[in-house]
Amino acid sequence: MDRFRGAKNLITISPSLPNRRGKRPITIRGPLHVQCGDHGDDRELRDLVDEVIAWPHIEAGPLPVGSVDLVSLQVGREVATGDPSVFITGREFGRVLFGAPTIYLTLPLSCAHWAIVRGWAEPHFSGSFGLVPPGVMVVYTPRDEQEVAVCRSLFWVSYNFSLTDRGRNSDEWNAPWVGVTHSSTIEEPVAAAG
């Protein structure tokens, strides 16, 4: 099986990001900040996380205080950028809860902006108190294949944001079976307030 089967259809995180259909899901805002409803099929989320875990240099596992219903996504020490503002904590760029399906990702601020404006995410509650970097987002879980594609793209942006140039230029990351033309920089336009 192609570990990057869906990475061929990445969506640009920019003004062209499609709007998420329907109302924003209800969330409980607090230190945990979870999505309360409007979840898709649990299997789609688990398959997406399995796909992301297979990407190069990703270490996945529960947090020390976690459970089997929580997956922490970290990049390997040798390829992690030294900028702490791109991580939730340590080298963790993403976290997924399965009990109350919720996705947490650290995104570049321009991507976070478009994810919020287009209805795909909201800032993590703890960011307003400086407890997590401002790019940490609660990304709404996918309800169908089109939404899986958007979430996959958001995971991809978060993952690349956490890598050093060396990590993005590694042989494994650039392997031909990946099926994606990679850019070593993330370039999204920043929206101007009007």
Positions of predicted regions on the chain:
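Charge-dense, helix-prone N-terminal extensions
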Residues: M1-G194
